Amino acid sequence: MAAFPHKIIFFLVCSTLTHVAFSGIFNKRDFTRWPKPRCKMYIPLDPDYNADCPNVTAPVCASNGHTFQNECFFCVEQREFHYRIKFEKYGKCD
């Protein structure tokens, strides 16, 4: 009877790991359902202050076909071009 709880624990751990492993394979991320960047949070209140964007790689594609490193770089560039470039999608441009 002492081995019975070990079998249950082993089964529960294996089934959990299997679920986690296969859920990432079959469910691809749908970037079209993600919200557009909230650029207000990246724009400094003082016009003389330069925005300090983090060095994080999370590509954003703009309407001009340029891929930006992340939302912050896109938002800063969008402000500098007086909002002529628009958000296209998350990920690299095709």
Swiss-Prot record:
Q: Which residues are glycosylated?
A: 55
Q: List the disulfide bonds.
A: 39-75, 53-72, 61-93
Q: Name one GO biological process term.
A: negative regulation of acrosome reaction
- SUPFAM superfamilies, alphabetized: Kazal-type serine protease inhibitors
Transmembrane parts of this sequence: none
Asked if Secreted is a keyword of the record, the answer is: yes
Residue ranges of domain Kazal-like in the record? 33-94
InterPro entries from the xrefs?
Answer: Kazal_dom, Kazal_dom_sf
Job of this protein: May be a serine protease inhibitor. Essential for sperm maturation and fertility. Inhibits sperm acrosome reaction, protecting sperm from premature reaction.
Q: What is this protein called?
A: Serine protease inhibitor Kazal-type 13
* Gene transcribed to yield this protein: SPINK13
